[in-house]
Curated annotation (Swiss-Prot):
This is Transcription factor BTF3. The gene is BTF3. Part of the nascent polypeptide-associated complex (NAC), which is a heterodimer of NACA and BTF3 (via NAC-A/B domains). NAC associates with ribosomes through the BTF3/NACB subunit. Both subunits can contact nascent polypeptide chains. It comes from Homo sapiens (Human). The modification N6-methyllysine is found at K46, K54. The modification Phosphothreonine is found at T160.
Length: 206
């Protein structure tokens, strides 16, 4: 037997020719396109998907309020008075304060006419730093409650308070019951006689 078909030959354009095998005389062979372009795009698509997932997670973390979000717990720091005192004492040591003994009381006068009174306080001072500290139990009292022992502590700034006090004293004496200056008591008062008892006795005798 004799072969009638001829092997296919490919030209420079990628088309093949066959002689005698097809009734038309020529046959073209098509080759699949190269896949290099699609392989390079797959990693880029994966990166974009991963970036979108990361962005969605970040948005969920940053979002405040709304349905489905977890409640944020507010951190409350409880500070005690002892901790504040320790910090204060540490700061005072840096300033080099010294204790002043023999202080029985400290009175601080306010513009409202009241007195902040400390009884037997702990007083510390640093003249170089121009710092004075008073530690103890403080009581807010009226200026009238501290009289007359506080008179020798009043300065020029307390003249207005003294004037107010002098104006308030007459009002208090008028509103309240003032004691009698003559020393007479209400129990010793004798009622006035209205009827004549001598005439009544004569009528009974007749």
């Amino acid at each position: 037997m004799r072969r009638t078909g001829a092997p296919a030959q490919a030209d420079s354009r990628g088309r093949g020719r066959a002689r005698g095998g097809c009734p038309g005389g020529e046959a073209t062979l098509s080759q699949p396109p190269p896949r290099g372009g699609t392989r390079g795009q797959e990693p880029q698509m994966k990166e974009t998907i991963m970036n979108q997932e990361k962005l969605a997670k970040l948005q969920a973390q940053v979002r405040i309020g709304g349905k489905g979000t977890a409640r944020r717990k507010k951190k409350v720091v409880h500070r005690t008075a002892t901790a504040d005192d320790k910090k204060l004492q540490f700061s005072l040591k840096k300033l080099g304060v010294n204790n002043i003994s023999g202080i029985e009381e400290v009175n601080m006068f306010t513009n409202q006419g009241t007195v902040i009174h400390f009884n037997n306080p702990k007083v510390q001072a640093s003249l170089a730093a121009n710092t004075f500290t008073i530690t103890g139990h403080a009581e807010t009292k009226q200026l009238t409650e501290m009289l007359p022992s506080i008179l020798n502590q009043l300065g020029a700034d307390s003249l207005t308070s003294l004037r107010r006090l002098a104006e308030a004293l007459p009002k208090q004496s008028v509103d309240g019951k003032a004691p009698l200056a003559t020393g007479e008591d209400d129990d010793d008062e004798v009622p006035d006689l209205v009827e004549n008892f001598d005439e009544a006795s004569k009528n009974e005798a007749n």
